[in-house]
Amino acid sequence: MTDPRIIVAIDTFDLKKANAIVDQLDPKLCKIKIGSVVFNALGKPFLQEIFHRGFKIFLDLKLHDIPNTVHETILGFHDCSIDMLTVHLSGGEEMLKKAMLAAQIIKTQVIGVSILTSLDESDSLNLFNNSLNDQIVNLFKLAKKIKIDGIVCSPLELEVANRILDSHTIRVTPGIRDIL
């Protein structure tokens, strides 16, 4: 069986609604994405329930903290059978290395978030003293250096990603469609 390429986000913290969405899905066809709002509301038991229903889990918490905290946070998911989880590439080389080490232990993939799509050119200049495109290039180069498992990026960044990253690096691009 091939790995599902579609990732469906559960974006409700109402357990009944979340289960109603999951009930409509087939684990052979998609993975389930759980973001921070849903995770904070429903916690590990919901992750474990989704896993036991046969789904691969994409935990989108966008971790960004000191290296040891990110490492320990990832290790804390050892009992959740997570397929992929996100960290911010802007957390830096040491944080990413520690994330990768922890991910190897719990057998998950680390997916690096480049630039949030809510940020624009002005934000990039203010935050990074760099143009948006140059910052994305820098982050993708860091991802390649660290040998991160994958990246999350805007579809508009795929051309740059394809130029910089290895062909085996996973690319996740968001698309939003309500199903309920």
What role is predicted for each listed range?
Residues 1-24:
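N-terminal glycine-rich anion-binding loop in soluble enzyme alpha/beta folds
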Residues 24-34, 80, 143:
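Catalytic domains of carbohydrate-active enzymes, especially glycoside hydrolases
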Residues 2-3, 65, 69-160, 164-180:
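Conserved anion-binding
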Residues 46:
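Pyridoxal 5′-phosphate
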Residues 32-42:
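Glycine-rich, proline-tolerant flexible connector loops at the mouths of alpha/beta enzymes
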Residues 51, 55-58:
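Short, structured active-site "lid" loops
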